[in-house]
């Protein structure tokens, strides 16, 4: 297998990795490597769960593996795994800029620290990563890195995969982006000798993240304080609740509902939540996915078409009312990579304010 790392000078892209497509035999070997690795991690990660829960989680993993084999993306995952490892060895995190944070395979391979099953299997929606059974798609493998590790990437990939047989006339591509927070977090880790993990986040960190989000999207200090005090009364914080708040603020100008609706079960702040509700009301997965991705952004005649689609499946009135109000939604997996870095930064702000202030 051959690799080529292109550098796009003059813009934010570090450059894309191009690699020659492995032969069918090599692809099958890669798939087996990932399957064995994931099954090993599965047994260790969820041993505290009940036997029934373990079977459900195993079914979720097998569903992803089936999609991975169908889309022939095993080497995408293995290459992303090596990029994450070489970054971590150099003291820098990576940032998933696509939707890999929603993948169990990515979590088991160490590409992301976020477990997409941590809030329950009922809130895990592989359709946003892999599409539906009738319309399968590949994940978005865009990865953010610190510029310091770019020189190590080609060397690492060549040493790891140079012996893999491939078709030298066909190339696949993985986009890489230069991300400032990867560099900052690596520098903070080196200066403090500490590297936080998601298990280290507590209420102080989450409160700091919420304040940072508010501070970044509003100008008047008095308004910031009022909103911060209001939101503290609405919900308690964990990673999932902060994720919902972050998604809400990203779309704060795209609907008219107040912050009080964050605890309203009929108010959806992510595509995942809206999709789950549609499917629960017997809207087919393909149709529901189209509505939450394209329907919420549609206008005019196209919007009317989606309204008729909802009426066709006799969804409750509150869903139609919600749909009439929203014009855009983010999916959770698109927000996770960004939010993880916000939490890492907030952790340093709380525990090493002097070092953070010097770098910010």
Where are these regions (language model features)?
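Noncatalytic, beta-rich nucleic-acid-contacting surfaces in large DNA/RNA-processing enzymes
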Residues: 3-360
């Amino acid at each position: 297998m051959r690799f080529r790392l292109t550098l796009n000078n003059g813009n934010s892209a570090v450059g894309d990795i191009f690699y020659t497509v492995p032969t069918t035999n090599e692809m099958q070997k890669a798939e087996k490597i990932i399957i064995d690795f994931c099954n090993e991690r599965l047994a260790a990660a969820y041993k505290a769960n009940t036997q029934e829960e373990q079977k459900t989680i195993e079914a979720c993993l097998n569903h992803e593996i089936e999609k991975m084999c169908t889309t022939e993306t095993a080497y995408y995952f293995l290459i992303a795994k090596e990029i994450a490892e070489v970054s971590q060895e150099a003291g820098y995190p990576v940032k998933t800029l696509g939707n890999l944070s929603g993948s169990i395979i990515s979590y088991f391979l160490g590409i992301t620290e976020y477990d997409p099953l941590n809030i329950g299997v009922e809130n895990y929606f592989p359709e946003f990563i892999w599409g539906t059974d009738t319309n399968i798609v590949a994940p978005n493998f865009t990865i953010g890195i610190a510029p310091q590790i770019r020189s190590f990437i080609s060397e690492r990939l060549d040493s790891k995969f140079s012996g893999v047989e491939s078709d030298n006339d066909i190339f696949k591509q993985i986009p890489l982006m230069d991300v400032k927070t990867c560099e900052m977090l690596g520098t903070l880790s080196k200066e403090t000798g500490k590297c936080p993990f998601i298990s280290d986040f507590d209420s102080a960190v989450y409160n700091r993240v919420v304040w940072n989000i508010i501070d970044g999207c509003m100008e008047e200090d008095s308004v910031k304080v009022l909103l911060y005090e209001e939101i503290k009364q609405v919900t308690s914080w964990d990673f999932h609740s902060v994720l919902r708040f972050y998604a809400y603020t990203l779309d704060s100008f795209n609907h008219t509902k107040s912050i009080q609706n964050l605890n309203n079960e009929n108010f959806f702040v992510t595509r995942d939540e809206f999709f789950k509700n549609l499917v629960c009301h017997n809207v087919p997965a393909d149709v529901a996915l189209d509505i939450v991705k394209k329907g919420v952004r549609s206008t005019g005649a196209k919007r009317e078409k989606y309204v008729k689609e909802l009426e066709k499946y006799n969804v409750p009135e509150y869903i139609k009312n919600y749909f009439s109000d929203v014009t855009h939604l983010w999916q959770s997996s698109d927000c996770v990579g960004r939010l993880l870095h916000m939490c890492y930064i907030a952790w340093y702000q709380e525990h090493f304010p002097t070092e953070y202030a010097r770098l910010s």
